[in-house]
Amino acid sequence: MKKILLICLLLVCALAMTACGKEPEKKVAMGPATAVFTTNMGSFEIKLATDMALNTCANFISLANKGFYNGIIFHRVIDNFMIQAGCPNGDGTGGPGYVIPDEFHKKLKHNDEGVLSMANRGPNTGGSQFFITLRDCPWLDGKHAVFGKVTSGMEVVRKIGRSYTDMNDRPLKKVVIEKITIEKR
């Protein structure tokens, strides 16, 4: 009888302990945000989709606020397609040391020039690398998470896109992100 009572007590304790797990994180709204890019070729602004891509935007904002992007180059530029940056190694192989899950929203599409999206190596492998489209690219929908749109300075983005590149689409003259400033607007 004591053995049965002891077993029942242990089962109750075990069940109680499983209920002590971490509560799932709740998304917290962050409000509007604009990323101001200052490069050696000029400046442009991107309105971040904080209301539809909260986690992706929060990751980007955190990296920008830490100065992660300061001094990083646009390492891949393909005219009439996109410009890509965010690799600390400058060659498309690096990241922040972690990955984030893909975050898709039905209203966020690669349907125009100036769309900001996460670069990746496959599903759920985004981190710090991003690209900005130079045209509509619907084949990227559902594969790369959109999280913003250029609102000012698209001529600078186009100018970067027209950079002369080598066989690996790397600009011959470095295009450097001097700083990304996040403004609450």
Task: Please provide the spans of the model-predicted regions.
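Cyclophilin-like peptidyl-prolyl cis-trans isomerases
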Residues: 5-185
